[in-house]
């Protein structure tokens, strides 16, 4: 079974339980594969980053077939407004956040009339995207301007600008090239932070003059 997020956002939990921590979010248009169903919960694997977690079955919206799913995967287009909306077939409005994938909106009979990107963008545009998240509150597992965590910020900024990186900082560090010195870095590069044991625990995006935008 396959699904698509047809809501503004859906919490993805560590376990199939209302009290379980939120480890990530589905945003509007995100695609996923169903791995298991348990009572009122569905274990999913998010298509973009293979992240696994549980969502409430009430929020599950099924895609008819694997063929439809594979077609939708090819049709990525990310909204560029801090917040916008899609209109349903019966003229209701659903708010959507920056970085929502509106590429599948027609499939679920929704219309969208806003700015979007479906290509790789340059560093200047990447930095402009990052600055849209300034003053967003910190939220563990969050991926929206209304609540976001450090690796959610880096993943969303890169995603909107056409780059695919993992969900968690400890995995993001393995992508790209290591730089020996800060002087070698450019705006838009990722800066990682470790603890006393050498484990990556935080990530931010480099700006000019070695400033960093991050969520904490």
Language model segments and positions:
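Short, structured beta-strand/loop micro-motifs enriched in basic residues and often containing a Trp
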Residues: 8-17, 73-89, 168-176
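Glycine-rich catalytic cores of cysteine/serine-nucleophile enzymes that process amide/ester linkages
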Residues: 26-27, 82-96, 100, 136-148, ...
């Amino acid at each position: 079974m396959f699904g698509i997020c047809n809501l503004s956002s859906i919490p993805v939990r560590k376990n199939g339980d209302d009290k379980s921590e939120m480890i990530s979010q589905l945003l509007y248009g995100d695609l996923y594969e169903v791995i298991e169903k348990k009572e009122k919960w569905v274990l999913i694997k998010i298509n973009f980053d293979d992240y696994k977690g549980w969502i409430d079955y009430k929020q599950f919206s099924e895609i008819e077939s694997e063929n439809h799913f594979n077609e939708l995967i090819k049709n990525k287009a990310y909204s560029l407004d801090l917040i916008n909306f899609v209109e349903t077939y019966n003229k209701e409005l659903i708010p959507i956040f920056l970085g929502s994938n509106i590429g599948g909106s027609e499939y679920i009979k929704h219309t969208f009339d806003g700015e979007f990107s479906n290509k790789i963008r340059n560093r200047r545009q990447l930095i402009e995207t990052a600055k849209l998240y300034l003053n967003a509150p910190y939220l563990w597992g969050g991926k929206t301007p209304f609540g976001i965590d450090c690796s959610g910020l880096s993943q969303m900024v890169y995603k909107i600008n056409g780059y695919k990186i993992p969900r968690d900082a400890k995995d993001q560090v393995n992508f790209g090239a290591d730089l020996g010195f800060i002087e070698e870095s450019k705006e838009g590069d990722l800066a990682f932070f470790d603890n006393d044991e050498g484990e990556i625990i935080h990530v931010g995006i480099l700006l000019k003059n070695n400033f960093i935008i991050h969520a904490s």
